[in-house]
Amino acid sequence: MTHRIAFIGLGAIASDVAAGLLADAAQPCQLAALTRNAADLPPALAGRVALLDGLPGLLAWRPDLVVEAAGQQAIAEHAEGCLTAGLDMIICSAGALADDALRARLIAAAEAGGARIRVPAGAIAGLDYLQAVAGRDDAEVVYESRKPVAAWRAELPGMGIDPDTLAESRTLFSGPAREAALRFPKNLNVAATLALAGIGMTRTRVEVVVDPQARGNQHRIQVRSPLGEMQIELVNAPSPANPKTSWLVAHSVLATIRRHLARFTIG
């Protein structure tokens, strides 16, 4: 069976995912993308990914699955229309879901259209554990994001920090996951994913650190409850095309697509 998969956005993550799908002969796919600029199409995908004109064009193409990888604004603009039309979605920009009103609208649209919403793990691990403790009022979750200067170069000047002279680690934020995800839409989707899987946007605590000595994009997750403790530390290689995101993210999205299409899954 050939699956029809449409991307919203065709940046670093979506391009890597598209290339992975096209290379998988065991799971043939037809691909399309809704993108603001046709020049975004990498040469390796030219002629292999159809370019769509706006949400009407995407709906007319009739995909089996829509993969959003364009940022939080794209969710506000396109997700509700896709879900109402009955199109299953994978949402990569999970930070948008920190907005309770938007998340409620999307869930209502999915119910009306008979569609499903999936959020990939992305750069992190341990979501199954967080889901297991989600209902406990006595659970504590702390997440630390520690990234090198390259991941924050565009934002640091606005915080009064010179990225070229920063010599020591600096805490940029400490607080609830909701505020972290909405304040840093390009860097903290992970915070929203953890909170949605676990104990919620308010109780999940987030520490954001820029560290000139950081080895890759580092993620530390600590969970404590009477059920036990979990500590995970990941050191992910940054994406070659976008240092704000981990290279692992595209592979996580690809794995989520394969699970969505599979008859047999684990986890």
From Swiss-Prot:
Keywords: NAD, NADP, Oxidoreductase, Pyridine nucleotide biosynthesis. NAD(+) binds at A123, N189. It catalyses: L-aspartate + NADP(+) + H2O = oxaloacetate + NH4(+) + NADPH + H(+); L-aspartate + NAD(+) + H2O = oxaloacetate + NH4(+) + NADH + H(+). PANTHER family: ASPARTATE DEHYDROGENASE DOMAIN-CONTAINING PROTEIN, L-ASPARTATE DEHYDROGENASE-RELATED. GO terms for molecular function: aspartate dehydrogenase activity; NAD binding; NADP binding; oxidoreductase activity, acting on the CH-NH2 group of donors, NAD or NADP as acceptor. Belongs to the L-aspartate dehydrogenase family. The iminoaspartate product is unstable in aqueous solution and can decompose to oxaloacetate and ammonia. Specifically catalyzes the NAD or NADP-dependent dehydrogenation of L-aspartate to iminoaspartate. Its EC number is 1.4.1.21. This is L-aspartate dehydrogenase 2. It comes from Bordetella pertussis (strain Tohama I / ATCC BAA-589 / NCTC 13251). The active site is at H219. Pathway: Cofactor biosynthesis; NAD(+) biosynthesis; iminoaspartate from L-aspartate (dehydrogenase route): step 1/1. Pfam families: Asp_DH_C, NAD_binding_3. The keyword Glycosyltransferase does not apply. The gene is nadX2. It is an enzyme of class 1 (oxidoreductase).
